[in-house]
């Protein structure tokens, strides 16, 4: 019932956009609904029974007069900062933020909201499953480490030898001009353990850049997202990989399709789950050793490739 | 020469003997029961039962209890302080703890859903009843005596006869009565030979009756345990894990028994896990998610004495809401009774028929069933009832009790009901031991709609309790 109304609404929302964009929103909405419906069937059955999957509109509650209020009171927060949302609100948030992220990719709030609204329970539960199946994953869930510029002691990392993970990481932060504190708090995910898992995933994201050496310019970001999607299965990354390239220039697309997508697919699939890496504990370890044990190949340096490309362009112009 | 020779002194064999001796119409028949192992512990139990519970415990339906009270007369000899009536079964799903179904017998005014009772308590009550009836020349129990051979004087044609280790040349007689050769060197010839001799029934093989079915490649691990304190809720708990159902069934006071159906690998693990870890493992099995269970099993597989798992279990338990833990789950298990763990291979089998000329099969000799609905021994009780009915009628009409004319009505009455029960339990087992997505979804929905559809449930309660 709700599926139809959501798609209906998305139709209205995108009539103003061109057909390509509509295609994206529909695909994305279907993907999200699909994973919502099929990935964790049984939990869904419970939700269905509790009425969580239904659009709790006036009509519904009118037929159950005595409990009408119960349906409209917001559930209690599960952890500090938690904003409990109804499923249909999450769907709206997803639709709104995906349109927003597409038209305003520079505005972080859309990206963040898109991330949280697509990181719906089934996906997070898959991550939780991965973590609970692994000793280190379990250790992380138990100790709940948080990554901030203070918890990581960046000064100390700067003094580590060049080939350590810590030094690679801090070098990458410095090169890209970002800090661990630029990550936003999770607030829309309902279960506190799942919320932590998503927080953890966000906080580790920079390490994925660091170990792969990919910059945060758009092509790098897309490549890391594909890599992440293959490795972890967060749909936000998959979506990013699907629609983001549409806005790229031809030369950028070629680099992506010929070099970075194949690399991301291969490395992402073959390497061990990155969510189970306790980064804080391996900062002093050798980065090449780490890549080897994890099964990650390093992609060609994107900035170098771009430089070469521009150099070639210039030379070509000079000649002409 | 005997009118009836019963092979097997398990619950089925002893029930049949006591029922025959209790009925005014069959009392006069000369009967001999032969049991391969010793029944001494059964007799001792009658005089002085051990302090702790034994590990073979069954759930009896009210119908079976009624049968014992009214037809066999052994219920008075049951040690009542060792049985536990319960009125509620809560079954739920490991892949979704919210998918649960409750059978509350009090809701349909039935009072009791089932009764937990040790096998040996039943067996000893039957001995008690037989003693009361008086063991005369027409009632003989030979224990410590194995049947080593069964022959038929008329089966001289080797090609026609299913041999199965049976020496056809030994018997020489003008009668077609089967001859039972015993480990004591004695031979007895019987007008009617009844096989209450369990799954591998030598009698069934002798009669050439085909039995169909399959091994589940699953073991039932049983154990006797102590709960934190006595649970006054009187609930039988069952959780469907992807490896098979785990049930905790109440006994008197803080005692309880478990049946944990599991894969061969898991059953081995359950038997070798440190006895002090075992109770916690049951608690984990009743509450935690499959992913945690798998992790814990793998830790214990590496080291069955790894007490670090307690920490893991505690941590994951702390994620469950306390109130829900108290209301929706069994009490914590705190102790494993020493040496009470054992495992039994589970299988489904059903004989094509229960009779042949001068032969009848009763109990596990005729059918074996998955224990998830606690029906095996109860089916044997209803077999005994139908067989005695058939013999009573045959005697009334002056017929030969070994003839198929008499025996056929036993099959006609007993077989279809058993077949249905076997089918239902087989389907339940198959539906619940899968983690194939669509089936899990359907069963989640199914179990919930079942829980809501009161009329369907009432029917099932009636079926479970045999009413
Ligand atoms: C784990 C588990 C849990 C169960 N839970 C329940 C439950 O909750 N409720 C329920 O109703 N049922 C339950 N059952 C089933 C129940 O235990 C059996 O159905 C019942 O014990 C069968 O009784 P029986 O007398 O037919 O056969 P058995 O108990 O197998 O008796 C056969 C007897 O024949 C003797 N015998 C065999 N061959 C010879 C020979 N050649 N010579 C002499 N003697 C011989 C054997 O020594 C044996 O004593 C459960 C079974 C298992 C494995």
Swiss-Prot record, chain A:
Pfam families: Coq4. It comes from the Eukaryota. Its main location: mitochondrion. One of its GO terms (biological process) is ubiquinone biosynthetic process. It is found in: Mitochondrion inner membrane. Residues 1-31 form a transit peptide. It is an enzyme of class 4 (lyase). Keywords: Lyase, Membrane, Metal-binding, Mitochondrion, Mitochondrion inner membrane, Transit peptide, Ubiquinone biosynthesis, Zinc. Its cofactor is Zn(2+). It is a peripheral membrane protein. Lyase that catalyzes the C1-decarboxylation of 4-hydroxy-3-methoxy-5-(all-trans-polyprenyl)benzoic acid into 2-methoxy-6-(all-trans-polyprenyl)phenol during ubiquinone biosynthesis. Component of a multi-subunit COQ enzyme complex, composed of at least COQ3, COQ4, COQ5, COQ6, COQ7 and COQ9. This is Ubiquinone biosynthesis protein COQ4, mitochondrial. It comes from Scheffersomyces stipitis (strain ATCC 58785 / CBS 6054 / NBRC 10063 / NRRL Y-11545). The gene is COQ4.
């Amino acid at each position: 019932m709700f599926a139809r109304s959501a798609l209906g609404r998305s139709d209205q929302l995108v009539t103003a956009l061109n057909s390509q964009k509509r295609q994206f929103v529909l695909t994305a909405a279907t993907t999200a609904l699909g994973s919502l419906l099929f990935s964790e069937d049984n939990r869904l059955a419970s939700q269905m029974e509790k009425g969580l999957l239904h659009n709790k509109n006036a009509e519904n509650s009118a037929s159950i007069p005595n409990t009408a209020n119960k349906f409209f009171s917001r559930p209690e927060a599960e952890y500090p900062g938690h904003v409990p949302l109804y499923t249909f609100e999450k769907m709206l948030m997803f639709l709104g933020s995906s349109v927003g992220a597409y038209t305003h990719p520079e505005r972080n709030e859309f990206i963040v909201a898109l991330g949280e609204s697509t990181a719906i329970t089934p996906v997070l539960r898959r991550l939780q499953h991965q973590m609970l199946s692994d000793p280190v994953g379990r250790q992380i869930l138990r100790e709940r480490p948080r990554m901030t510029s203070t918890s990581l002691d960046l000064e100390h990392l700067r003094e580590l030898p060049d080939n350590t993970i810590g030094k690679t990481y801090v070098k990458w932060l410095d090169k890209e001009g970002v800090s661990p504190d630029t990550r936003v708090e999770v607030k829309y995910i309902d279960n506190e353990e799942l919320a932590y898992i998503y927080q953890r995933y966000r906080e580790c994201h920079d390490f994925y850049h660091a170990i792969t050496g990919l910059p945060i310019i758009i092509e790098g970001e897309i490549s890391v997202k594909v890599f992440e999607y293959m490795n972890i299965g967060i749909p936000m990354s998959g979506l990013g990989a699907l629609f983001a390239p549409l806005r790229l220039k031809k030369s950028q697309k070629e680099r992506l399709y010929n070099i970075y997508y194949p690399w991301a697919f291969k490395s992402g699939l073959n390497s061990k789950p990155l969510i189970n890496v306790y980064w804080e504990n391996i900062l002093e370890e050798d980065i090449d050793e780490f890549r080897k044990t994890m099964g990650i190949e390093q992609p060609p340096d994107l900035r170098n490739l771009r430089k070469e490309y521009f150099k070639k362009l210039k030379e070509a112009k000079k000649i002409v | 020469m005997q009118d009836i020779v019963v092979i097997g002194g398990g619950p089925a064999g002893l029930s049949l003997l006591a029922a025959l001796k209790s009925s005014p119409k069959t009392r006069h028949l000369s009967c001999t029961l032969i049991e391969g192992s010793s029944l001494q512990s059964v007799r001792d139990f009658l005089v002085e039962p051990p302090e702790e519970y034994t590990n073979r415990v069954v759930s009896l339906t009210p119908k079976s209890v009624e049968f014992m009270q009214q037809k066999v007369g052994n219920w008075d000899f049951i040690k009542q302080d060792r049985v536990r009536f319960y009125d509620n079964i809560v079954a739920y799903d490991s892949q979704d703890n919210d998918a649960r179904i409750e059978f509350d017998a009090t809701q349909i005014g039935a009072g009791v859903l089932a009764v937990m009772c040790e096998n040996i308590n039943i067996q000893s009550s039957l001995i008690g009843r037989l003693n009361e009836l008086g063991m005369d020349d027409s009632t003989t129990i030979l224990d410590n005596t194995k049947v080593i051979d069964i022959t038929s004087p008329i089966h001289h044609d080797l090609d026609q006869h299913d041999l199965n280790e049976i020496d056809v040349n030994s018997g020489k007689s003008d009668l077609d009565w089967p001859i039972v050769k015993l480990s004591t060197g004695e031979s007895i010839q019987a007008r009617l030979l009844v096989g209450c001799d369990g799954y591998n029934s030598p009698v069934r093989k002798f009669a050439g009756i085909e039995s169909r079915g399959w091994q589940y490649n699953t073991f039932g691990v049983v154990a006797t345990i102590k709960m934190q304190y006595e649970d006054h809720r009187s609930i039988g708990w069952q959780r469907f894990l992807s490896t098979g159902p785990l049930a905790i069934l109440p006994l008197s006071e803080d005692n309880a028994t478990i049946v944990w159906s599991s894969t061969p690998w898991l059953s081995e693990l359950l038997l070798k896990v440190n006895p002090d870890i075992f109770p916690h493992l049951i608690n984990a099995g009743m509450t935690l998610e499959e992913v945690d269970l798998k992790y814990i099993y793998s830790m214990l597989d590496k080291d069955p004495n790894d007490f670090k798992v307690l920490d893991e279990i505690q941590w994951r338990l702390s994620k469950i809401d306390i109130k829900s833990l108290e209301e929706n789950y069994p009490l914590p298990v705190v102790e494993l009774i020493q040496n009470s763990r054992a495992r039994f291979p589970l299988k489904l089998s059903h004989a094509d028929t229960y009779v042949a000329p001068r032969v009848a099969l009763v109990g596990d000799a005729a059918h074996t069933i998955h224990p998830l609905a606690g029906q095996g021994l109860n089916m044997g009780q209803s077999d005994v009832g139908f067989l005695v009915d058939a013999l009573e009628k045959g005697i009334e009409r002056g017929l030969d009790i070994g003839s198929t004319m008499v025996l056929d009505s036993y099959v006609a009455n007993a077989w279809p009901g058993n077949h249905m029960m076997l089918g239902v339990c087989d389907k339940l087992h198959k539906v619940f031991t899968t983690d194939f997505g669509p089936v899990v979804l359907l069963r989640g929905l199914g179990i919930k709609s079942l829980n809501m559809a009161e009329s369907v449930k009432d029917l099932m309660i009636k079926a479970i309790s045999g009413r």
